[in-house]
């Protein structure tokens, strides 16, 4: 169905659809690809930012814990079984208090012996029956002898701070040292980390509870769907929904504590970050479509306009107007088609003109042939009649000779008939003379008409020479315009340089100067193109001058031929006059022969035998004359048919305007 519509559509519609598809589809693909690429880039950038922030927070945690692990190792080397003796307890207490004063980030530092002794700074009264060996921190450190143990975060019962205990068994296994590290600084640091606009960092312990979160409280249980992905691997990223919004999360696991440090950000921020690029892309596509649409309009117009002109001219030629031509403005395929069309029209014009001329000549020749054949037919018929009469006379003369009485009268009658035939020939000669005079007048009119044509050709030659001079003046004016355009371009360039030197104050002037320079360049280019056209016109004028000179020469030759024809008709007329005089003389002689016929009576007997022989020959001649008359009639009929065909051909050619 679509293919059928395209076949019925105009060339303009087909070109428009093709250009629109070529323009819009790549623009949409490029725009959509750019938008998706921007989203991907922003997503990677934000994820990278989240990973960097998570790593920074992980390093902060490691730094805090590492320093306390070093301190714990130091004290476990310092304290031993002797340190828990009664005389050394105060010394241990002093060292712990000194350390506590130097490290405000800790809540307490303490040590417990395997015998149940417990020393702490700051010093507080422990409940009765308190035995450090029964505490989790002591058991875990003793269980992992030689390693530093870090407990899960918990809330201090005395201060309410969130703390972790860093514990290590003494080297001699006489006791365990513990440092309660306040992690409020770590929590506060995590709250200060921003990912994107509304993203944040959260910390979860190894028991899947919240340590730090902007909206959840420490100790809260995390959601099961998040927990499942978060604790499935050491590091990674995934997406989940929170309060109906898509969130991206990237996380790592702190190797010392087992905590999960996660960077969480809304997915809509990626879209919002990519939207400006999307809108800019839409704007660029819109502008491109507008500019492309304008260009497409002019391109299609440059194709369709000459084709429409070609269709109109073709229709005129099909209707018989062979003078129609089209103006060619380009050298592309359409321009070549236009030139070929003009060449075809010129060739057809030349062919029809030649056929018309030939048809006229054939018609004239056929008419002349018809007239000549008619005259020949009449003359032949007269000769046949005369021969028949001579034959009859010969028979009569033969009979009269045989009878011997009526011979002289028969001869006299025959001579009288010859005189009558001579009179008829004289009449035909007078008719021929009249036709020759008419032909002479027609030739004289032709000579006059050829003279008028010669004068018109001479006048056209003068006009074309004047047009050549005018085209040369136009060429000189175009050179001046091109020189002015070059000077304007140079001035615009100088103005742009001065405007650039003026800085921001000359920026507007620089734009104007640049536009002037562009206009100057366009003027120069246009004047150059016009110059080319003027040169082509001058070349065509020279060709026309040469052709007009050739036409003048041909017209002059025609005048010479026409004058010669006129002279020939004059000679024919003179010859006809001479013939008429001779025929008149022949008539007079025939009359004289009638008078003298009686004088030849004595000779009739001698020629009687000869007359009998001639009678048979006359019969043969009469038969041949009749056959010749039939042939002349056939030629005459063919000439008439040829004349009719020539007239029909002229009528057909007359439909064409040449």
Curated annotation (Swiss-Prot):
Subcellular location: Cell membrane
Transmembrane segments: 15-35, 284-304
PTM sites of type Glutamate methyl ester (Glu): 368, 627, 634
Chain segments annotated as coiled-coil in the UniProt record: 44-109
Residue numbers carrying Glutamate methyl ester (Gln): 592
Ranges per topology, Cytoplasmic: 1-14, 305-658
Gene3D superfamilies: HAMP domain in histidine kinase, Methyl-accepting chemotaxis protein, PAS domain
Residues exposed to the Extracellular side: 36-283
Domain Methyl-accepting transducer: 372-622
Residue list for modification Deamidated glutamine: 592
The Cache domain, residue ranges: 150-221
Principal subcellular localization: membrane
Entry keyword set: Cell membrane, Chemotaxis, Coiled coil, Membrane, Methylation, Transducer, Transmembrane, Transmembrane helix
A GO CC annotation given for this chain: plasma membrane
GO biological process: one example: signal transduction
Cystine crosslinks: none
Job of this protein: Chemotactic-signal transducers respond to changes in the concentration of attractants and repellents in the environment, transduce a signal from the outside to the inside of the cell, and facilitate sensory adaptation through the variation of the level of methylation.
Sequence similarity: Belongs to the methyl-accepting chemotaxis (MCP) protein family.
Name the UniProt record assigns to this protein: Probable methyl-accepting chemotaxis protein BT9727_0469
């Amino acid at each position: 169905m679509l293919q059928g519509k395209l076949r019925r559509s105009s060339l303009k519609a087909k070109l428009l659809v093709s250009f629109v598809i070529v323009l819009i589809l790549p623009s949409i693909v490029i725009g959509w690809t750019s938008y998706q690429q921007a989203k991907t880039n922003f997503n990677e950038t934000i994820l990278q930012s989240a990973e960097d922030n998570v790593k920074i927070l992980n390093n902060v945690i490691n730094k805090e814990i590492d320093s306390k692990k070093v301190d714990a190792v130091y004290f476990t080397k310092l304290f031993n079984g002797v340190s828990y003796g009664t005389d050394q307890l105060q010394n241990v207490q002093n060292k712990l208090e000194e350390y506590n004063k130097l490290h405000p980030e800790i809540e307490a530092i303490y040590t417990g012996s395997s015998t149940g002794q417990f020393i702490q700074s700051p010093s507080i009264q422990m409940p009765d029956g308190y035995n450090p060996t029964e505490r989790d921190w002591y058991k875990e450190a003793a269980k992992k002898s030689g390693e530093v143990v870090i407990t899960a975060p918990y809330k201090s019962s005395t201060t309410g701070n969130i703390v972790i205990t860093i514990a290590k068994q003494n080297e001699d296994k006489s006791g365990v040292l513990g440092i309660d590290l306040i992690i409020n600084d770590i929590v506060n640091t995590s709250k200060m980390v921003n990912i994107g606009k509304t993203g944040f960092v959260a910390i979860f312990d190894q028991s899947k509870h919240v340590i730090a979160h902007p909206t959840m409280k420490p100790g809260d249980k995390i959601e099961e769907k998040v927990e499942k992905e978060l604790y499935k691997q050491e590091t990674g990223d995934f997406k989940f929904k929170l309060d109906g919004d898509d969130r991206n999360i990237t996380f790592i696991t702190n190797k010392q504590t087992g905590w999960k440090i996660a960077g969480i950000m809304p997915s809509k921020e990626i879209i919002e970050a990519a939207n400006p690029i999307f809108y800019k892309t839409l704007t660029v596509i819109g502008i491109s479509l507008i500019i492309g649409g304008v260009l497409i309009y002019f391109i299609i117009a440059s194709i369709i306009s000459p084709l429409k002109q070609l269709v109109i001219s073709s229709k005129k030629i099909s209707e018989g107007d062979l003078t129609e031509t089209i103006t060619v403005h380009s050298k592309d395929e359409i321009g070549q088609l236009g030139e070929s069309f003009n060449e075809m029209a010129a060739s057809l014009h030349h062919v029809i003109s030649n056929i018309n001329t030939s048809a006229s000549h054939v018609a004239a020749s056929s008419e002349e042939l018809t007239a000549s054949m008619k005259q020949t037919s009449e003359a032949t018929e007269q000769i046949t009649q005369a021969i028949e009469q001579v034959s009859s006379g010969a028979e009569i003369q033969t009979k009269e000779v045989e009878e011997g009485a009526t011979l002289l009268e028969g001869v006299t009658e025959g001579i009288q008939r010859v005189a009558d035939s001579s009179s008829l020939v004289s009449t035909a000669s007078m008719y021929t003379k009249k036709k020759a005079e008419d032909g002479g007048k027609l030739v004289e009119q032709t000579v006059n008409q050829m003279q008028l044509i010669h004068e018109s050709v001479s006048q056209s030659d003068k006009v074309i020479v004047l047009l050549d001079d005018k085209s040369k003046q136009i060429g000189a004016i175009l050179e001046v315009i091109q020189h002015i355009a070059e000077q304007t371009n140079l001035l615009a360039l100088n103005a742009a340089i001065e405007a650039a030197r003026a800085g921001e104050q000359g920026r507007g002037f620089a734009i104007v100067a640049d536009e002037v320079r562009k206009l100057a360049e366009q003027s120069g280019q246009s004047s150059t193109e016009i110059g080319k056209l003027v040169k082509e016109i001058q070349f065509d004028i020279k060709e026309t001058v040469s052709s007009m000179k050739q036409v003048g020469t041909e017209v002059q030759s025609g005048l010479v031929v026409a004058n010669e024809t006129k002279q020939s008709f004059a000679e024919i007329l003179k010859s006809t006059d001479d013939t008429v005089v001779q025929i008149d003389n022949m008539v007079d002689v025939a009359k004289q022969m009638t008078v003298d016929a009686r004088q030849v009576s004595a000779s009739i007997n001698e020629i009687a035998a000869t007359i009998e022989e001639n009678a048979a020959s006359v019969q043969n001649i009469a038969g041949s004359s009749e056959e010749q008359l039939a042939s002349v009639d056939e030629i005459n009929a063919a000439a008439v048919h040829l004349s009719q065909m020539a007239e029909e051909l002229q009528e057909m050619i007359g439909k064409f305007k040449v």
